[in-house]
Amino acid sequence: MSAPLKKQERTLMILTLLAIVLLGVASTMYFTRIDLTSSRAFTLSKAARGLYAEIPERIRITYFISKSLADRHPGPAAIEDFLRELEAVSRGKIQVRIVDPTKNPAEAESFGLVAQQMQVVEQSEQRLALVYTGIVVEYLDRHQTIPAVLSTDTLEYEIVKAIRASIRDKKPIAGLLAGDADKSLANDYQTLANGLAQAGYEPREIRAGTAIDDDVDLLYVLGNANLDRYDAAFIDDFLMRGGKAFFAVKGVNIDPTNGLVATPVQEAGLLPMLASYGFNIASQLVLDQSNLTVPFQTQAPQGGYQIQYVRYPHWVAIDARYTSATNPITAHFAGLDLYWPSPMTLRPVGTVHYEELAKTTTKAWLQTKNFAAGPQDQPLYALERDTTTGQYLVAATAQGSFPSAFAVGAMPTRAGSPPPPAPKATSSPETRIVVVSSADFLTDMMSMSDSTFNASFALSAADWLVSADDLIAIRSRAVVDTRLNRIKDADTRAFLVVLTYIVTLGLVPLAVIGYGLLRARKRARKEKESRTIRGGEA
């Protein structure tokens, strides 16, 4: 190769390397990001981009992160990127600091952040290290703390919620009222309570049959089997004062301590009150072909106990196709599993606006009598299927002015207890209600059935109830049902299983064999032609 060509090659190589270096430097200063996720999980929401308009004075966000953790985990880098992007669109209203508190943890600890233990390996030696990772949002003399942050999954929701809480200097209070005798907040609703606390709400236990304070922003009524008219009167009084409520109720009570024996819920309790608001819950059970597989402990034939997995149509997996695409609660539907739901119908009252949130599939059916819910009752599950197959409503919302259920007639009484307050008006101010016809879907059973998106549904409903609609889309896009159970129809599932066997065990091996035979035939033909050519040349 001539000297001029070699010189040109060297020059071209040097210029190429220089261009790569300059491109790398430029990418640290100017960059863009393409979000290919279906839920736009890595794109700032409209609520976050417009947050500057809600901030009167500058907000300071401090991310306390130990360098030892940042060097070993990808989460902190993603968190810092998110905070910097939020700072960039805030028009100077948000200032972000990144602080390593390892040497001087006093500032972090003054905000309530505590060190977390992490196993690290250095020079072939394993040890426990104390690391910090948490975010503090400061506004004037107030602050909100987000502890133990290690991913961006729900960070945008938590940051926006914390900023708004700092500005307003108040966390919304969510009252939790357990309405079943066998359940309590401490033993059965910790997943929900913890989720509410993490989402920026202050959970507060409400005892049945007591007045609900004015500072409660929304009320969860969790179950209704142990609530009578006296208890319902206090809930009605809360709504008549403009309170918002989420009702998780049932028409049939299931006793898990007695072989899942099912009995209708007393009609004189909460259900008549809901009926006066336009929600009729039948004393029946809805079963659906879209359901969960549930492990039951049953008696083994040879004695002792065994775990039996049962396709359990009483635990209904709601299909996204049968949810409202317009209501913010379900517009970004992540999943919802209902345990022993009852059918619901709507009977509009006054000027109240109702919206159907979720329905079963079109192949659901009912148990209207002779309830059979135990694993030993499988042959009885579908006795009424032929006569009751159809689609049934299981969740709905309503907003408007509701008539008081106690405006007419004498107020209920209870011996030894003070009388409930009489309605101050015959109808409520403008308010909102959510009703789901399953009382148990928000219990801690959701963790056992891998249905923790139930809690996300309840939190989205809370945001809708307190009119924080723009936060719902942020929360919902971080929660996805990842279970491989999309095919609900039993016949379709069976057909696809057979088709999979045919393809993997039949067609694929035959294709490989056919390809091999074809290659062998081509090779033999080429060898024959080659021998013919060599013979002719000879």
Predicted feature locations:
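Acidic carboxylate-rich catalytic motifs and surrounding loops in phosphoryl-/glycosyl-chemistry enzymes
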Residues: V99-K103, R207, Q284-D288, R475-S476
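Conserved GHKL (Bergerat-fold) ATPase module
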Residues: T154, S184-N187, V265, R531, ...
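Juxtamembrane extramembrane loops of integral membrane proteins
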Residues: K7-A232, D236
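Acidic, S/T/G-rich, low-cysteine, solvent-exposed domains in lumenal/extracellular/periplasmic regions
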Residues: R168, L185-D470
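Short linear loop/turn motifs
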Residues: V120-E125, A129, Q284-V294, A478
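Extracellular ligand-binding/catalytic regions of CAZymes and related secreted enzymes
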Residues: S2-R60, V160-K171, N280, G350-Y354, ...
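Extended, charge-rich low-complexity interaction segments
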Residues: V120-H143, R311-I329, Y501-T504
